[in-house]
Amino acid sequence: MEKVLNLALKQCEEAEVFSYTSEEIPVEFESNRLKNIESSQSTVIALRIIRNGRIGYGAATNLEDAEKLVAMAVETSQFGMKARFELPAPQQYLDVKTYDPAVEKVTIEEMVQLGQELVDAVTGASSEIMCDAGVSRASGSVTIINSKGLNATYHSSLFSMGIGGTLIRGTDMLFVGDGKYSSHPVRSGKEIIENVLRQLDWAKEQAKIASGTVPVIFTPHGVGNALIAPLTSAFSGRMVLEGASPLKDKLGESLFSPSLTITDNATEDYEAASAPFDDEGVAVRSTPLINQGVVENFYYDLHTAALAGTQSTGNGNRSGGGLPSPGINALVIGEGDTSFDEMIADIKEGLIIDQLMGGEQGNILGGDFSGNVLLGYKIENGKIVGRVKNTMIHGNVYQLLKDVAAIGSDGRWVGSSIYAPSIYCHKISVASE
């Protein structure tokens, strides 16, 4: 990496070399049977330069041809955007624990057993269901060096497991599933199994819900499906700068329910998305986006922060080794004190949304979302009475989250980077056949 940096500095004012290496072993089940076990390794080397005030970029999968990588960055700098920022100097990072060596010690046999237990438990509850499952362990490292003297590295581990099932009866298709991610080994699938069996139990009966406006409970999965995309895009520093965010002039204003607090926080030990620094070498931090209903911060990388006249929030994220852009690290929605059962008991007639298909349709930047309810349940007189079919919902995230009835005490990680409780809202528009 130092060779690439030194070669680049002969032709530019500033330079940065980013390296990401990973090794993953996934165990895959398909149609209730073990299908595949494989090991994969990947490396990405990315060079970003500032030459004649413009940004150049090149990427490779190894360091064997440093001259070619530098030439690529120099060539692209002729057409690159103007660099309004400076690369970060060495700085203090929080001691965020991201690596557990125990992950790499989990044997393939143990992983196969965990996956088989998931499949056996779900098919044992429903002999007709077809399941795909996966158990994976991975480790990796990120290194960034730059011309300001920054030289930073961290190692990470990730263990994940999950299952998805499809139950087909005639023209009726039921989809269920759950998963878990951690920087520690996951030794048991009990929680996943319980969640999927609960989905199957609630879906045994079918129930019709009339078109109109009804109260709605979004489960943690439902929150992730329906509400997160409009919110995260609106808080992006890039969208704010482009004038596309409806929140662009709203800092300090109370636009949401006072019960709602949302933070971008990748500083917690051993969480799957945690890290000491972002993909530009800037220290990550806990950034409140919404604090008790008040719009408090936007998130930035170096480039957008410079354009906005502020500091990076440590949200410079790369996709596949590409140029950094503002991105959420780990979105944490604060829990409330209402149980899921208490929410259900409060509703005479309403809807539970667990999985939404096509939730990112509509004017996302305006907060709109709509989609088909892939997995949802009807509530009657404080009880779940069955699964709804052929039902669509549409709403606006700003209106919904301003009129919150309760926030659940049942927070959990949904995927690797969203922590969400259930959210009970007073009304949503429903269209049912």
Language model segments and positions:
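N-terminal small-residue-enriched
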Residues: M1-E433
